[in-house]
């Protein structure tokens, strides 16, 4: 997993104290499984707050949706895949020459799964949108929100945004583009574009 849960880094007493503080201050403690999806969940929770939903209703919604946030992403910079052990040095060198883009997702445990590879950015965008059609709520009739994050490749993010908006005409608003944070970017590298959306339950490792 690319991140450690807070409970894994604390002793039992510290974790129990945090839970007690949350209970006393009206703060809900939720294990989001993976940090990359927080923006979409927080945005949805804020919408429910504005609709007048209670804390319990919002918490239940987040708990239900946390495994339904999909993360589809591709990368054009293979040396970071080599550094993280997802690709051998020889494969990274050959892939760079051929313009290979790994297509990745997060599984139900929040682990990065490289499930396909294509040649060129256009094919990477097309494969990402194709996968989104298969997993998004109501398929091409998806009416939820979609976010895109990128690491120093705004043009690629904008091209992906255009493809997503063309494929999903009923989106809830314009696709929002954000920067990938420095911690995640240090793992994924520059040239990474990620698409976030609500869909079916994220599949475990070994599934498409």
Regions found by a protein language model. Give the residues of each.
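Mixed-charge interfacial surface used for oligomerization/domain docking
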Residues: 10-24, 30-208
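Extreme N-terminal basic, low-complexity initiation segments
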Residues: 1-4, 8
């Amino acid at each position: 997993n690319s991140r450690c849960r807070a409970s894994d880094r604390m002793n039992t007493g510290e974790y129990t104290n945090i839970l007690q503080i949350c209970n006393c201050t009206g703060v809900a403690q939720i294990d989001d499984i993976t940090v990359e999806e927080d923006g979409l969940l927080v945005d949805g929770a804020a919408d429910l707050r504005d609709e007048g939903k209670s804390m319990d209703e919002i918490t239940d919604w987040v708990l239900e949706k946390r495994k339904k946030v999909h993360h589809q992403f591709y990368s054009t910079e293979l040396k970071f895949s080599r550094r993280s052990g997802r690709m051998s040095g020889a494969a990274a060198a050959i892939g760079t020459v051929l313009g290979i883009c790994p297509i990745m997702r997060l599984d139900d445990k929040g682990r990065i799964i490289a499930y396909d590879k294509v040649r060129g950015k256009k094919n990477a965008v097309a494969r990402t949108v194709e996968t989104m059609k298969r997993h998004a709520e109501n398929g091409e009739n998806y009416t939820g929100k979609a976010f895109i994050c990128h690491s120093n490749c705004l043009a690629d993010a904008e091209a992906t945004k255009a493809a997503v908006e063309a494929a999903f005409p009923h989106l809830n608003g314009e696709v929002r583009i954000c920067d990938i944070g420095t911690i995640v970017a240090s793992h994924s590298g520059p040239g990474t574009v990620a698409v976030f959306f609500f869909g079916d339950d994220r599949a475990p490792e070994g599934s498409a």
